[in-house]
Amino acid sequence: MSFSFRRIALIFAPAAVLLAVGGIAAGTATAGTTGTPHHRAQTAQAAPPVDHQLCYNAYGSQFAIPSGIRLINQFSPNGFIPVITPTVTVHCNPVQKTASGVVYPITNPNAHLACYPISETTQPTPTVVVTNQFGSATLVPSQPNLLCVPSWKSLTGPPGKSPTTPPNLNHFTCYPVSVKSGAYHPPTVLLQDEFASAPVSASVNPVPSELCLPTEKILPSGQVFPIINPTLHLLCFQVSQTPIIPQVWDENQFGTSPITISSTKWLCAPSTKTVVSS
């Protein structure tokens, strides 16, 4: 991408994000009014956009996670305390996506996601309608299985950042989903993240795998990591293989670890959500 084109794309990044969720600005305003009073308060501020994420099967085990972390999201407004496995199994990079000639640029290049398996007592999983640039469908979530944490990433060694959480990216709780009705129709896309030297053509499976909800995280110490953008979720689809770098380093509030990257897993698209039944 030329400098002038990139500059234009970045100027219109917020518009691209709205297009990415169906071009429904009114729906964005409405969705932000749901949830707890804390979540509603976020709408008084301009929420940063949410990038597409290209996620990889990964392994990294040098993290220390305290017990007693409480997660709050729109499915579980009273929160729940999961058991969090201190091993990263999914690593996500912000990715530039080009679909049908429209470029969705990266707006927060330093903010990645490191995802940890979770287990918990049974949580509410209401049926939802999820809409993005690939279409709209009614989805039935299963129990949450991942906590994705904003993380710094380095290709050469421990990032050594302070604070250890990059700004302007939500935590996410992810739920496996099945399609009840409707369908997504993703075209062939071009993807470029930090692992690729140029845009790569990729095929996206039209059946989504996971829905990731913006999540407030509360540490046992009382420290709160609030929801930054309550409206935009991530809906993740299996995607064909793209270039990888075999080892990176992730850093977040749980520590720093080398991460082994094994294969491309998902393309996660910014999406809006409406609850249709509990």
Predicted segments — roles?
Residues 69-106, 128-167, 189-226, 249-251, ...:
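Short, flexible domain-boundary/linker segments around small modular repeats
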Residues 21-46:
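C-terminal region of N-terminal signal peptides and the immediate post-cleavage residues
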Residues 2-13:
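Bacterial N-terminal signal peptides that target proteins for export
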Residues 12-23:
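Bacterial N-terminal signal peptides
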Residues 50-65, 109-124, 168-185, 230-246:
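Extracellular/lumenal glycan-associated surfaces
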Residues 15, 38-43, 49, 67, ...:
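Generic low-complexity segments that are intrinsically disordered, proline-rich and/or Lys/Arg-biased
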